[in-house]
Curated annotation (Swiss-Prot):
Site (May be important for catalysis) location in chain: C286
Gene name for this UniProt entry: Fuca2
The protein, known as: Plasma alpha-L-fucosidase
Any one of the GO CC terms: lysosome
This protein's record includes keyword Phosphoprotein: yes
Phosphoserine modified-residue sites: S293
Glycosylation, residue list: N163, N231, N369
Catalytic activity annotation: an alpha-L-fucoside + H2O = L-fucose + an alcohol
Source domain of life: Eukaryota
Gene Ontology annotations of biological process type: fucose metabolic process; glycoside catabolic process; regulation of entry of bacterium into host cell; response to bacterium
Species in which this protein is naturally found: Rattus norvegicus
Compartmental location: Secreted
Subunit annotation: Homotetramer.
GO molecular function: alpha-L-fucosidase activity
SMART domains named in the record: Alpha_L_fucos
Amino acid sequence: MRLGLLMFLPLLLLATRYRAVTALSYDPTWESLDRRPLPAWFDQAKFGIFIHWGVFSVPSFGSEWFWWYWQKERRPKFVDFMDNNYPPGFKYEDFGVLFTAKYFNANQWADLLQASGAKYVVLTSKHHEGFTLWGSAHSWNWNAVDEGPKRDIVKELEVAVRNRTDLHFGLYYSLFEWFHPLFLEDQSSAFQKQRFPVAKTLPELYELVTKYQPEVLWSDGDGGAPDHYWNSTDFLAWLYNESPVRDTVVTNDRWGAGSICKHGGYYTCSDRYNPGHLLPHKWENCMTIDKFSWGYRREAEIGDYLTIEELVKQLVETVSCGGNLLMNIGPTLDGIIPVIFEERLRQMGTWLKVNGEAIYETHTWRSQNDTVTPDVWYTSKPEKKLVYAIFLKWPISGKLFLGQPIGSLGETEVELLGHGRPLTWTSSKPSGIVVELPRLSVHQMPCKWGWTLALTNVT
């Protein structure tokens, strides 16, 4: 009897293991895939940096949609730019050799990303123009190894980010390409044919994941084709079940026409999405420092860039409503991050050094912003009995009126982050509290562009 049990034990363990594996596996259906819990690190991170870089950085005019606006829509602004600056017969493909990345230094980029306070980065491995920032075998002579830089940009940044920072490394990938012959052929068949995803999109997606192991896979650009044309659910089932990043990878919602804001890991819904209220599903506000372009554009004026005050406001509003902020920059054709982007990144890092406690690893509170003082937004850490009130304007009176928190005498404590001393507060009628802020000179302020009160034991 005992011998029989010993002989049966390996089979029992195998069966148990099989049940555990299958319990965590996902079928290639949205119903199954949408049940996958989002890896915890993403919600804890709160803040990431988006980098739009490609051949569009060579003309660096108008936006990263330069090729489309010039050749497809024939917008006068773009046609005139080419007529005035390039010889007749110049093609968009001719920009490829001019995309030199001459001064691209992945270590410098990584150090700047670390200084920004961001916890993840997403690089455009391929935008709608089809040029890949790695040596894709499926993008012959239209990739960064064969043309222009003659370097594997994706690999260099991946190594630098993982060796020099605590950021999670992510990749953006455009499913479609504006002018690829196979995509245009499929499009003309109302997407009954699938030559393009089979020959181009899917092989590149599998290669990106296996070769660079991104922890964010940011899909975009469905070209009007549904998810079944892209074979999205089969790919995501592999990503979640078998890929080398199956336990940590997060994905967005742009996997085919009709999937956005409906299916996927977290929702982006639209560019610059900031609903201003709590959502039932994890979401991300992907936005740009340059108000009018994701890629670098040399004709931008100073007023076209969001100020640090506006960026802090975006971050605070987004996190208070349960989202992550993905803030975009655009490097130049030779690999330099323009000074104005560098300044904004470093300013965000400076602000987060003081106020990061109220951002990273926080939860939403019962109220997202205050009813009495509108420029106050709330986050919380329930396990520490903490509520954070982030206020974007310092009141002239020196008193901050908060309509939402309810304090308890002898229990509630209030502290200004970066100041370190308890503050005096009183109850307010009909509800809320009034906090007496410290009298500080400009040089004594813990930060410049928004401040945080840590409230202990409030309801």
